[in-house]
């Protein structure tokens, strides 16, 4: 299984943590598409704590963290 952790507005309608079968998702992009997250809403993508790109491969046991752009002021 792949653990996907969502943050801030990405949790809306999806939850905080989503578990997905590794064999169905060859890369982070396929997970982002499955969760119906527009790519422009992905500001930071971490795989096992390391900054990665959506085309990076994922495997069983990976922890994916997806953060949206954050504004403030």
Q: Which role fits each region the language model picked out?
A:
Residues 1-72:
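Ubiquitin-like/PB1-type beta-grasp interaction modules and other compact soluble beta-rich domains
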């Amino acid at each position: 299984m792949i653990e996907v952790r969502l943050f801030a507005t990405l949790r809306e309608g999806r939850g905080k943590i989503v578990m997905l079968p590794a064999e169905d998702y060859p890369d982070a992009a396929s997970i982002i598409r499955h969760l119906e997250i527009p790519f422009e809403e992905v500001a930071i993508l971490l795989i096992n704590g390391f900054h990665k790109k959506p085309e990076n491969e994922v495997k069983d046991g990976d922890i994916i963290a997806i953060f949206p752009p954050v504004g403030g002021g």
